[in-house]
Swiss-Prot record:
This is Core protease I7 homolog. The keyword Protease applies. Induction: Expressed late in the viral replicative cycle. SUPFAM superfamilies: Cysteine proteinases (SSF54001). The active site is at residues 258, 269, 353.
């Protein structure tokens, strides 16, 4: 933990992440979409609801019985069944029962023909999207363990302690940071790809590249060839720049065993391009060599150019990849005019840098973020995400081994089943408790309002 890192007031005040913080995020998301928010109640099954709500227009049956849309089941039924007119002689009470009949007829056909289900849904497409993307992907890593960020001491607590002031905040007894986590909980670039790439098939302005991996970075030879693996990246960028249907190019980055990510907007301002970087540990402008193209987003959401900071003459090793990558991107993208970096720290402890990046990229594609203000709102929305929430969303956006018996069973299951892993249940518990708190608060506000109206009415009557 570096004491030059900036943090948001909600973290310095140690507002409970699972309480006040989650409640604020839930409430703000309902007020003209002030913040971006993934509502966990929509992610309670193995269906990839983010895809289905875009392509499955049957509200009654979407995400029920099977993740395959009913209209595509009807197409398959007509293609595969010997007597497709048979269904027209059956009187179904509702579309759910109709979908149930279609599904089990097709499933029996696949079993009788000894057709592998996973191969089948990988090869078949509906509205241009493979059926395999209509279910969530399987999480090969372990679920991570972490605590609410309000339980951790902050740099300001440390400074308070130095001058004899006891810790101040909603949680007055902060705990020490725990030991390092087991690598079995680390996400892979494949996990990020499986979660984000399918969304780019719905909102097609976004192009996703699988990974830029830094094996090493030589301070004296800051060239891509000496430090970075990015197989076929240049070819992808050339195609992207020629493709008028694509505006954003995004990719995760691994450097020093830490995930960060970058999103490039080729139409940031007319013919100018911009690169948005996100780091759950934050960037420290004072430790990065001066660059006139670098812009830093502070915890109060102001954006400052690099010249406003007393920066080091040589970039610290922790951020050296930025200099390498910005030079390289500037070359292959034919000049990038602005590079934006968040200065604020979100991740205190957990092994969930991958999940922080998934949430950042998920917000962008799912909410179709494009404008400068929307990106600024995106960085603000991330301020509500800490170790606990990032860890909990792992249980919502993926299927884990705690939800189904094995990966083989997962691959060969077409039916809808409920998510039951502890991380998802933890998230739902937060949702329930904080929804009740909001309703109780709203009830108190209503009582105050009604009392005010009654008093005002009585006052008017007494003056008549």
């Amino acid at each position: 933990m570096n004491n030059k890192i900036r943090r948001f007031p909600n973290k310095n005040l140690k507002m409970p992440e699972s309480g006040i913080n989650f409640m604020s995020m839930l409430f703000f998301s309902k007020i003209d979409n002030m913040v971006y928010f993934i509502n966990p109640i929509k992610y309670n099954t193995n269906a990839n609801i983010a895809i289905l709500e875009k392509i499955d227009d049957d509200d009654e049956t979407r995400g029920k019985v099977t993740f395959i849309p009913i209209k595509y089941l009807e197409i398959l039924y007509n293609e595969l069944v010997l007597d497709p007119n048979h269904i027209n002689n059956i009187n179904f009470e509702n579309n759910i029962k109709r979908k149930f009949f279609l599904f089990w007829t097709i499933k029996k056909y696949l079993q009788d023909k000894n057709i592998n289900i996973n191969t089948f849904i990988t090869s078949k497409k509906y509205k241009g999207i493979p059926l395999v993307y209509m279910r969530k992907s399987f999480l090969k890593s372990e679920l991570s363990k972490t605590r609410d960020f309000s339980t951790f001491a902050t740099i300001y607590d440390d400074l308070d302690a130095q001058i004899g002031i006891p810790p101040l905040g909603f949680n007055p007894k902060p705990k020490a940071y725990p030991r390092k986590h087991d690598k079995s909980t680390w996400l892979s670039s494949g996990d990020i790809y499986n979660c984000i790439y399918p969304l780019t098939m719905i909102n097609t302005d976004y192009d996703y590249f699988h990974l830029i991996l830094f094996e090493k970075t030589d301070k004296n030879i800051a060239t891509v060839a000496s430090s970075m693996r990015c197989y076929k990246l240049e070819d992808r960028v050339k195609f992207f720049l020629m493709n008028d249907k694509k505006r954003f190019f995004m990719f995760p980055i691994i450097y020093n065993d830490h995930f960060t990510c970058c999103v490039i907007d080729k139409h940031f301002d007319k013919d100018k391009k911009a690169a948005y970087f996100f780091n759950s540990s934050g960037y420290i402008p004072e430790l990065i060599k001066q660059n006139k193209k670098y812009m830093f987003i502070e915890s109060d959401m102001t954006i400052k150019s690099h010249k406003h900071y007393n920066s080091t003459p040589n970039t610290n090793y922790a951020y050296l990849y930025i200099d390498v990558l910005s030079e390289y991107l500037n070359d292959i993208f034919k000049n990038v005019n602005y590079y934006f970096f968040n200065t604020f720290e979100l991740q205190y402890d957990s092994p969930d840098c991958g999940m922080f990046n998934i949430i950042f990229l998920y917000y962008i594609v799912y909410f179709n973020i494009k404008s400068k203000f929307e990106f600024k709102k995106l960085y603000y929305s991330m301020s509500f995400i800490g170790d606990l929430l990032a860890s909990s969303y792992r249980g919502a956006l993926f299927i884990s081994r705690y939800d189904i018996n094995s990966i083989d069973e997962f691959k060969n299951t077409l039916e809808i089943f409920n998510i039951k892993n502890k991380k998802f249940m933890e998230l739902i518990d937060m949702y329930k408790k904080n929804s009740n708190r909001i309703m109780n608060v709203c009830s108190k506000i209503k009582n105050d309002y009604d009392s005010y109206i009654d008093n005002e009415k009585n006052s008017l009557e007494s003056n008549i």
